[in-house]
Each structure stands twice: as C-alpha cells, then as structure tokens.
Amino acid sequence: MNNARPIRRALISVSDKTGIVEFAQALAERGVDILSTGGTARLLAEKGISVTEVSDYTGFPEMMDGRVKTLHPKVHGGVLGRRGQDDGIMEQHGINPIDMVVVNLYPFAETVAKEGCTLADAVENIDIGGPTMVRSAAKNHKDVTIVVNAHDYDRVITEMDANEKSLTLETRFDLAIAAFEHTASYDGMIANYFGTMVPSYGENKEGDEESKFPRTFNQQFEKKQDMRYGENSHQAAAFYVEANPEEASVSTARQIQGKALSYNNIADTDAALECVKEFDEPACVIVKHANPCGVALGKNILEAYDRAFKTDPTSAFGGIIAFNRELDAATATAITERQFVEVIIAPSVSAEAVEIVAAKKNLRLLECGEWTTKTTGFDVKRVNGGLLVQDRDQGMVSEDDLQVVSKRQPTAEELKDALFCWKVAKYVKSNAIVYSKGDMTIGVGAGQMSRVYSAKIAGIKAADEGLQVEGCVMASDAFFPFRDGIDAAAEAGIKCVIQPGGSMRDNEVIEAADEHGMAMIFTGMRHFRH
C-alpha cells in the first residue's frame, strides 16, 4: 500500500518568517494552493505569491485583535479529516482537505526574556490557534504534513520533487514528532513562567517576591547521540543537549577527530573545561574521574601544560586536558609524545595541531569556541523519585572580598597563589584540599570523608612526585571544623591557608594558624562539590 500523500493545499501561518517566502514560492511553483493569515499572508502577497486569506476561506473574519483567526471548523476539519473516512462529512459542510500545515508559534520565550516584560505582554504572546493547528496536523500525520522548523523546508521540497509532489508516511511521522516536541517545549516555557509568578497576579506588592523555581520543572533537551554504554558497561546511555545553548561548552563542542565520546569522557571534559574557564591567563587543566589532578598557568599553554602535568603524571595518564587558548603545534606535540590522553578540548585548534594529533587516531580532539561570560542557569541532580535543582555555582571571590583573620598578613605571592588554588578547589570533589605555589598545583586531595585526610593525600601526592610542599598555599573548599587540619598543614610546611570560615570553632582554627605563624584568609563563600 502506497503511504505517500500528495500536497495540494497548505496552510501557512508563522511568527518566525525565516525562509518562508522561498518555501511558499517553491510550493506555489509545484501547484500547491496556499491559505494564510495576517502578517504571513500580507508578506507572501507582497512577494507576488498567490495566497487565500483564511478569513476569506472560512467566511469568518479575524477578530479580537487577532486572537481568533484559525479556530474554525473549516480549518480544523480540513486538517483533522481522515482521508477515505470523513470525506462525506467534509464535502457536506464545504470543508476542503488541508494537506500541509506550516506553523511556528508566537515568540513567548523571547518576549519574557526582554527587560521590562509585563504579565500582560507575556499573555498576549501565548499562542492559541498555532498550537491547536500544530497538534491537529501532528495527530493526523497519517494524512497531513506538519512543518514547524524552517530547517525542514528544503527537506520537504526535495522529497516532493523526488516523489511526485508527495511525502511519505515516514517523513510525516518524523515531522509530527518534531511538532509535538515543539508544542511541549512551548507549553513548558509558559508553565515555567507562570509558575514563578507571585500570588498577586504578577503585580509585585510589598512583601511579594518572585520565585526563580517554578511549581513544575519543565526543560527540554534534544538527543545529540546514543552511547555504547553509560558510566558502566551494563548501563544504557545517551547524551542530551539544550536546544540553543548560549555558552561554549562540551555540549556545543565540535569533534575534529577520534572515537565517539563516551559517557565518562563527556562528564570529565565538562569538569575540565569549566575549571579552565575560571582563568584569564593561559591555563591548562588535567582531569581524571571528574577531579583536577593538575592545574597550572603559564606564559603560554605549552608551559601551562608542562607544569600541570608535573603535579601528578600518574593520574594524568588517560586523562582529559582542557585549555583556554588555541591548541598550537608545539603543545600538541608535547602531549602526544609524552602521554596517553582520552580527550583534548580547547577554544580552537590550529591546522598544524590537527595534523599532529591525527597520528593518534583514537584521541578525541574537540573545539568548543571562545567564551566571554558564563550564562546563568540551573544545576540538577537526580535522586530516587525526585530532582534537586539549584543555581549554577558561579560564585567566585576577588582580592577585595578576602578577609585576613590571622596575625600574619599573607605576602603578595601567597595572596596570588591563594586566589589561584581557591579557583581550583571549587572544581575538586569534597572534601577538597589543594596545595599550590607559583600558579601551579602541588598536590590535590579529593573526595575524602575527612578534611584532614584530604590534606594528607595532597601531601602524599606531592611527595610522590618530588614536589616541595614547604611554602605552599592550601585551599579548602569548606571550613575546618577542628584545628587538626591546620596542625597537619603546618607540619607539611604550608604557610598560608584560604578557606570559607564559618565554623563554630573558627577561633581555635585561627589560634592554630597564629601558633604556626601561618597566614589565614577567609573567603566567606563555600564550594562544596558532590
């Protein structure tokens, strides 16, 4: 049985008019009758395309400032009518079949994102007729084609030309899926917006506050790739991304070469890239199992890589390397000659570096593009039966935010190192301890249940690599509940500590620092990472 359906009549009504004139012209040239509404109809007519206004077709005018345009039985009957089953009733009521619906919706997201948008503005950008037509056409995809995305226009025309002006059921079904995804996303945005409104009907009264967290949490992600497996080989997995991510990230990165990214590759690459974004100077971050094992700055990325690698060459094997500058030939050569690496990611990659890395055909090389500022958004964590939602941790301190609480003031060099290792500690799993000196990590202690043991591990790692802890700065992602961590740090040779403060025993901890002649800096900001 031939499941192709010819396109003889199309209804076109779009808010985003990208490519619509060319698409409508192509349909008209193929003998398709075009129905349209409002601004779309005027635009097509101005371009010399023959078009019938929906109001002329239905005999019912647009009204209520355009709120009622397509909500009419002659429109929805033409879209929903089942060919071969409803033909008689359609003919009885003068309803012509509509074979294609081309609709995208009022720009609700763009409207509410504008500064000064009122609830009234938002309400007037809630599309009613559009989603109704989209859902009607998608429901009746057995007979009707629905097109909601401009990037599908060329695909439709190409298939019509190859298939006697018809489209297959497979194509109609695929376009119907896109349509339901489109309306689901649209309704989710509206629900999120209204879900953050204060009880006083959108009018802020004294004492009212808007919540940034809606009553229901609606977000839509598009599947970018299926994976061989997840975190472990017995777990199925896929990678989903935001529809239009604004910030350079692992989600937006272009893979230049190498094997397909695994679940763990993506998680680790995200950790490495987000950490390296914290630095303005040329920087390198090496990550293993989502923890930085080496971070350093340099006069160029080759020097930064060399110094980051020295922190923990053992853990760097099979790791992820991220840079905040273009990957050049010299750095690519140093990496490929020195170590096995799973992924390299950088804002850009030189042509010479691409050629060098090509010799390691399995190495995954990613180019993510430049970034300027970080976008706001939510972090989510799945728990059994629920979802934890919070702001992204974009908190960071400057020198002006720091409070020196010890008798000894930090030197200028210690202060610089303190700010450096504080940035690193933010990306180390709690309990996190970082030793650093000269804009280079010396030891990293991650993920221990006891903060003092994280400090011990940082010292052990430094000793294993022959790195000198004496004179280092220590960063802790959270406060020290007891003085034992400070005593252990002093014994290891730490001269300056940066930490949030806020413990019930802060006075005891500060006393310990003073006893050991250490400088201690409070940030007033914690960076737990679980």
UniProtKB/Swiss-Prot annotation:
Q: Name one GO molecular function term.
A: phosphoribosylaminoimidazolecarboxamide formyltransferase activity
Span of domain MGS-like: 1-148
The domain section of the record reads: The IMP cyclohydrolase activity resides in the N-terminal region.
Query: Source species, please?
Result: Aliivibrio fischeri (strain MJ11) (Vibrio fischeri)
Lineage, please? Bacteria, Pseudomonadati, Pseudomonadota, Gammaproteobacteria, Vibrionales
- One of the GO biological process terms: 'de novo' IMP biosynthetic process
InterPro entries the UniProt entry points to: AICAR_Tfase_dup_dom_sf, Cytidine_deaminase-like, MGS-like_dom, MGS-like_dom_sf, PurH-like
- List keywords of the entry alphabetically: Hydrolase, Multifunctional enzyme, Purine biosynthesis, Transferase
The name on file for this protein is Bifunctional purine biosynthesis protein PurH
The record's gene field reads purH
* E.C. numbers: 2.1.2.3, 3.5.4.10
The record, for Pfam families, names: AICARFT_IMPCHas, MGS
Q: Its annotated pathway?
A: Purine metabolism; IMP biosynthesis via de novo pathway; 5-formamido-1-(5-phospho-D-ribosyl)imidazole-4-carboxamide from 5-amino-1-(5-phospho-D-ribosyl)imidazole-4-carboxamide (10-formyl THF route): step 1/1; Purine metabolism; IMP biosynthesis via de novo pathway; IMP from 5-formamido-1-(5-phospho-D-ribosyl)imidazole-4-carboxamide: step 1/1
- Tell me where on the tree of life, at the top rank, the source sits: Bacteria
Q: Looking at the keywords, is Transferase present?
A: yes
Catalysed reactions listed for this entry: (6R)-10-formyltetrahydrofolate + 5-amino-1-(5-phospho-beta-D-ribosyl)imidazole-4-carboxamide = 5-formamido-1-(5-phospho-D-ribosyl)imidazole-4-carboxamide + (6S)-5,6,7,8-tetrahydrofolate; IMP + H2O = 5-formamido-1-(5-phospho-D-ribosyl)imidazole-4-carboxamide
Recorded GO CC terms: cytosol
Keyword Transferase attached = yes
Family from the record: Belongs to the PurH family.
